[in-house]
């Protein structure tokens, strides 16, 4: 199931850097993290769903690239985002 508009708007409101911000790295990573967590639950239940697994891997790669970009450009924002999302324990 795709992310609902309400949930996506809630995530955007929480991680936006300013009013109307939908494309900042923080927002993109937060939305991808929600989608990845959602797909992980699906994969645990449907182990042979290889198409979904491939989509999950693409989303993980996209998030990894965005996080690498953020780490290169602004380490403080990167650390705050990682901590708030609960990544890299």
Curated annotation (Swiss-Prot):
Subunit structure of this chain's protein: Part of the 30S ribosomal subunit. Forms a bridge to the 50S subunit in the 70S ribosome, contacting the 23S rRNA.
Species this chain originates from: Streptococcus uberis (strain ATCC BAA-854 / 0140J)
Classification via InterPro entries: Ribosomal_uS15 (IPR000589), Ribosomal_uS15_bac-type (IPR005290), uS15_NS1_RNA-bd_sf (IPR009068)
NCBIfam families listed in its UniProt record: S15_bact (TIGR00952)
Record keywords, A-Z: Ribonucleoprotein, Ribosomal protein, RNA-binding, rRNA-binding
GO molecular function terms listed in the Swiss-Prot or TrEMBL record: rRNA binding; structural constituent of ribosome
Family membership: Belongs to the universal ribosomal protein uS15 family.
GO CC list: cytosolic small ribosomal subunit
Purpose of the protein: One of the primary rRNA binding proteins, it binds directly to 16S rRNA where it helps nucleate assembly of the platform of the 30S subunit by binding and bridging several RNA helices of the 16S rRNA. Forms an intersubunit bridge (bridge B4) with the 23S rRNA of the 50S subunit in the ribosome.
GO biological process, alphabetically ordered: translation
Matches recorded under CDD domains: Ribosomal_S15p_S13e (cd00353)
Protein name, entry field: Small ribosomal subunit protein uS15
